[in-house]
Amino acid sequence: GLELSDKWESGVEERNGTMIRFRVDEELFGEYSYNMDYVEQMVRNYTYLNLGLKIRLNGQEYVSKNGLLDLVNDNMSSEPLYAPIHLTGEDIEIVITHGGGYGESYYSFVNGQYTPQGGTHQAAFREAIAKTIKEFFRKDYDPSDIRTSIIAAVSVRINDPIFESQTKTKLGSKDKEAGV
């Protein structure tokens, strides 16, 4: 894009960061419309993955103080069966709880990229949950029973990830189960 001005907007509280205004070139794209639900979800995801990041979109401010814990809490449709477990490491962040539903609900990310189709990192996480519960209780529970009603978020940072398509919706890297 073209830089139109290097002056600060009036009323800006802080003099750091970047302000971006985006307008579609109607000569190139004609009458273009935004899917604002999609844009808002992307903005929310960026704030969940970058603690303290503030993004203003159409006058609404988005910020997360607790990372993926906020993502899980914001997407709970009912009270969890137990307080979400939030684990962070150098290259990984995980939040897990169980709700009152019957399915499995995952939010997965690789290097800040939302991977709605999951991938090897999510598969490794699912296996690790089942294995941990089975070993802890010394019972041969069926993994699907353990994961029923799970609500979890997984974010990994890995070098040179390999995705299964150009859209980066599913991680295909097999290196050490993609960080999990």
Each model region followed by its residue ranges:
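GHKL-type ATPase core
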Residues: 1-77
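Alpha-helix C-terminal capping segments
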Residues: 71, 86-87
